[in-house]
């Protein structure tokens, strides 16, 4: 038996022997202490404060607020919940089985703008604002598309330094915006979430100095830009600085009247800000589960709300359709599974399906043809879940739901 199957079998066995109503690893995640909230120094790595911190991040870190819509988009519930099942490791499972197996804090399934299923675990509720982690990168991409349409950015083939003069002479500044969107600057950057990687180094400099200084700590390019996908969160920070330069305002203030309110958010969102006043950008956007669902609906409708086009459609297609990507960025090429667009992950398969993904299991999966959205927030054991049972079962769940309404 393969190691992954052994892990899954053990996980399922543990789930079956848990007390009725118990969530996976709830004791490790702090149930006895009421799922405590961490501090700036430990919230990202400390398992014992993970659930609390991931749903209360803005209670202890400085942030911007994106105010809710005056008239929220109605999210009607289905008259009765359909039986949603999926096949995994030669077994058939339900939504509730998925929650019993995995450290899911919240889950939504939406079809044609209608809420089919909604679940919460670990005492989380519909009022909690869940952290996006790197799903925020896709939101930054949407802002780039809007700024391009408003002619605040002349061309995606312009270099970043044309707009962010402080990055002149630095490889990030001399990279085309399009290549930054594709995580293809060619600048080496190690991101493994162990506290000692380049990502940690970058964040430490950013916390004590500023974003420009942190970016200048990476002064060399090793691969020709635009030729190779290499995931690096600091490239989204480059886009965040670019947006501040061209809009003259915070990213949150820019997006509130252009995205958050027009899409019909029912609650305020928050975005953690850094020492220099810019949003984290690459992560730390916080919203209630249903508003993440509304974002998914917007994307499933190709950026439109009714007759109003919120996100430029052609930009969104460029961002999310693997057929529009160079060969190196297509599924099974950028990574062994996903392709990569403009800060979006692209599923393999002939049809256009894409994802917003964040560490520890945060996910929004979108199928525009089926108008189908799956939202998952989580507190997975490890930051990188790609090769773990969590990711494999999550993919099986998505494929199972897609298969009930269409075909892969």
In which residue ranges do the predicted regions lie?
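Structured C-terminal helix/loop/strand segments within mature extracytoplasmic catalytic/sensor domains
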Residues: 23-37, 42, 353-408
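Active-site-proximal alpha-helical segments within enzyme catalytic domains
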Residues: 141, 235-242, 281-304, 362-378
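N-terminal leader/targeting segments and the immediately adjacent pre-domain N-terminus
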Residues: 20-125, 153, 182, 396-408
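Catalytic-site signature segments of enzymes, centered on catalytic residues
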Residues: 120, 126-127, 194-276, 283
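Active-site helix/loop module of the DD-peptidase/beta-lactamase fold
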Residues: 131, 150-188, 220, 245-282, ...
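Bacterial N-terminal signal peptides
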Residues: 9-17
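Active-site SXXK
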Residues: 113, 131-156, 180, 239-243, ...
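Active-site Gly/Thr loop motif
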Residues: 266-269, 317-373
């Amino acid at each position: 038996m393969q190691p992954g199957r052994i892990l899954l079998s053990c996980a399922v066995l543990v789930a079956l022997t848990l007390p009725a109503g118990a969530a996976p690893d709830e004791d490790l995640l702090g149930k006895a202490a009421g799922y405590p909230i961490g501090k700036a120094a430990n919230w990202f790595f400390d398992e014992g404060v993970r659930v609390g911190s991931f749903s209360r991040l803005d209670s202890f870190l400085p942030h911007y607020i994106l105010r809710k819509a005056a008239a929220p988009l109605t999210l009607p519930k289905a008259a009765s919940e359909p039986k949603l099942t999926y096949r995994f490791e030669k077994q058939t499972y339900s939504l509730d089985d998925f929650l019993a197996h995995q450290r899911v804090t919240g889950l939504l399934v939406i079809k044609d703008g209608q809420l089919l299923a909604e679940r919460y675990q670990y005492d989380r509720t519909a009022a909690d604002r869940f952290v996006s982690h790197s799903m925020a990168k896709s939101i930054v991409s949407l802002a780039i598309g809007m700024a391009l349409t408003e002619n605040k950015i002349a061309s995606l083939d312009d270099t970043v330094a044309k707009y962010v003069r402080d990055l002149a002479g630095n490889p990030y500044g001399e990279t085309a915006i399009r290549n930054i969107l594709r995580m293809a600057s060619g600048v080496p950057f190690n991101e493994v979430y162990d506290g000692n990687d380049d990502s940690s180094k970058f964040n430490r400099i950013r916390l004590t100095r500023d974003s420009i200084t942190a970016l200048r700590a990476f002064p060399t390019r090793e691969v020709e830009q635009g030729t190779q996908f290499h995931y690096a969160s600091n490239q989204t920070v480059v886009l965040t600085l670019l947006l501040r330069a061209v809009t003259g305002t915070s990213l949150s203030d820019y997006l509130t009247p252009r995205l958050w309110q027009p899409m019909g958010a029912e609650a305020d969102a928050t975005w953690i800000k850094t020492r220099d006043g810019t949003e984290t950008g690459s992560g730390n956007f916080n919203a209630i589960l249903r508003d993440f669902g509304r974002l998914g609906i917007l994307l499933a409708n190709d950026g439109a709300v009714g007759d109003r086009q919120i996100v430029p459609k052609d930009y969104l297609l460029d961002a999310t359709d693997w057929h529009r990507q160079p060969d190196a960025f297509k599924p099974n090429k950028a990574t062994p599974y996903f392709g990569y667009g403009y800060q979006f992950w692209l599923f393999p398969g002939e049809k256009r399906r894409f994802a917003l993904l964040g560490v520890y299991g945060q996910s929004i999966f979108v199928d525009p043809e089926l108008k189908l959205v799956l939202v998952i927030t989580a507190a997975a054991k490890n930051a990188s879940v790609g090769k773990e049972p969590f990711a494999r079962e999550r993919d099986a769940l998505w494929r199972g739901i897609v298969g009930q309404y269409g075909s892969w």
